[in-house]
Amino acid sequence: MHEGKITQIIGPVVDVDFVDGQLPSIMDALIVERPDGTELVLETQQHLGEERVRTIAMEATEGLVRGMKVVNTKNPIQTPVGENVLGRMLNVVGKPIDGLGEVHATKTYSIHRPSPAFDELSTKAEMFETGIKVIDLLEPYSRGGKTGLFGGAGVGKTVLIMELINNIAKQQSGYSVFAGVGERTREGNDLWEEMKESGVIDKTALVFGQMNEPPGARARVALTALSIAEYFRDEENRDVLLFVDNIFRFTQAGSEVSALLGRMPSAVGYQPTLATEMGALQERIVSTKKGSITSVQAIYVPADDLTDPAPATTFTHLDATTVLSRSIAELGIYPAVDPLDSTSRILDPNIIGRDHYDTAQAVKQILQRYKDLQDIIAILGMDELSDEDKLLVARARKVQRFLSQPFFVAEQFTGLEGKYVRLEDTIKAFKEIIEGRHDSLPENAFYLVGTIEDAIKKAKQLQNA
C-alpha cells in the first residue's frame, strides 16, 4: 500500500507528497480518510518533480489539513455497472445518494476508458421518433447519434430534455442513463420523483454532480454516467439512451480548476485543453456493431452567444442540433425551437424519405420568407404586401404556431394535456397547412395543440365561444 501525505490545499486542488518516490499514475484515484471516518477521493492530475503530485478533489476539501495520510488505490475512479445500478442514484465516485443502501454490483468500470476502435463503429443512419413535432419534422434525431439542445438561460432546455426522457423512455423499452452535471438540485429531485411516479425509474440509472458540488465532481460525473452506458452497450449489446444536462458545466468545471493546475488560460478564459477534454468525452459516445448509445445533451449558451468557445467546440461533435431561441420563447411558442437555426445530418431524402424531406424544406422556405418580410411589415404594415405574400404570411404564422406543442412534463404549468404526435401525422398536417387546406381556420387554433385534428376541434370551440 503506497501512502503519501497532504502538503498543500488550494480550494479543490490538493498537493500530495510520496516520499518513497513511487508516484501514482495520472488519473489514479487517491483516498484520504477524514477524522470522522468518511473517505474523500482525489484524482491525480500532474506530477510535480520526483515526489509530489497535484490532484483534484471529488468532494469539498473542508476539514483537510497538511500532513494527512493519503492512500494510492493504483486505479482510476471505479463506478458500479450493470443491472443493479438501474433505479438508483449515484454520485461521481459511484456511491449511492438515494438513501436506499449499497449498490450490490458484480462489476465495476473505470470512468476513464478508451473510445471504441474505428473498425468497431456502426455507420447505419436511422431516424428515431421523439413525438415532438418540430424535432421530428425539421431536425430528426438519429438512433445512435449525438444531439445537442442549445439555449441560453431560461428558454426551456431542461423541460425539453425531461419531455424527451418521458416520451422516449416510455415509448422505447430500452435502458436510459441520466447525467446531471452542474445543474439545479431541485430539478434533479423533480426528475427522480417524476420517474418514480411514471414507472420509468426501473430502467434508468441516474448520476448526479450538481451545482453545489466542487469542480472535480462536475468535471467527472459525465464520465461516470458514460461508463455505465458503455457497459450496457458493450457487455449486454443493448441500445442505450444517455441524457446529459448540462454539458457546458463539464467545460465550466474544467476551466475553474485549470488556472489552479497552472495552465495558461485560452480564449475567453477557458482551459487550453478544452477541445481535448470534450473530444475524449464525445468520442466515447458512439454506436458500435454490438449496440448503440443515443445521446441528448443540453448545452447552455453563455449570453446567448453561439460563437462562445464552449458551445462552439461541442457543435463539431453533434449529428443534430436543436437551437432554442429567446425571441421564439418571447412569442410564447414552446418548445422555443428555432426551426431555421436547428440542423440534422439525417435530413436527407435517402434516409428519411422524399415526402418527409420535401415537407421539411417547404416549412423552412415559408418560415424563411416570412422572416425576410418581417422588416417590411414592421415599417409599412401588412397592407403594403402583395396578395401572394399576405397569403404566405398567414400560412407561415399558422406553421409557426403549429410548431408549438403541449408537453406531458409541463401539464401542471400549462393546464393542457401533453401530446405525443406520430411522425406520419406531423408530416400530413404541415403538408396540408402549406397547401392551404386550412386557410379558413384562425391562427389561434394552431397554438399549443397536438395533431391537425386537435386544431380543427379547437377552431370549432373558438367559433362557438
UniProtKB/Swiss-Prot annotation:
Produces ATP from ADP in the presence of a proton gradient across the membrane. The catalytic sites are hosted primarily by the beta subunits. One of its GO terms (molecular function) is proton-transporting ATP synthase activity, rotational mechanism. Its main location: membrane. InterPro entries: AAA+_ATPase, ATP-synt_VA_C, ATP_synth_F1_bsu, ATPase_a/bsu_AS, ATPase_alpha/beta_chains, ATPase_F1/V1/A1_a/bsu_N, ATPase_F1/V1/A1_a/bsu_N_sf, ATPase_F1/V1/A1_a/bsu_nucl-bd. F-type ATPases have 2 components, CF(1) - the catalytic core - and CF(0) - the membrane proton channel. CF(1) has five subunits: alpha(3), beta(3), gamma(1), delta(1), epsilon(1). CF(0) has four main subunits: a(1), b(1), b'(1) and c(9-12). This is ATP synthase subunit beta. It is a peripheral membrane protein. It catalyses: ATP + H2O + 4 H(+)(in) = ADP + phosphate + 5 H(+)(out). One of its GO terms (cellular component) is proton-transporting ATP synthase complex. ATP binds at residues 151-158. Belongs to the ATPase alpha/beta chains family. The gene is atpD. It comes from Chloroherpeton thalassium (strain ATCC 35110 / GB-78).
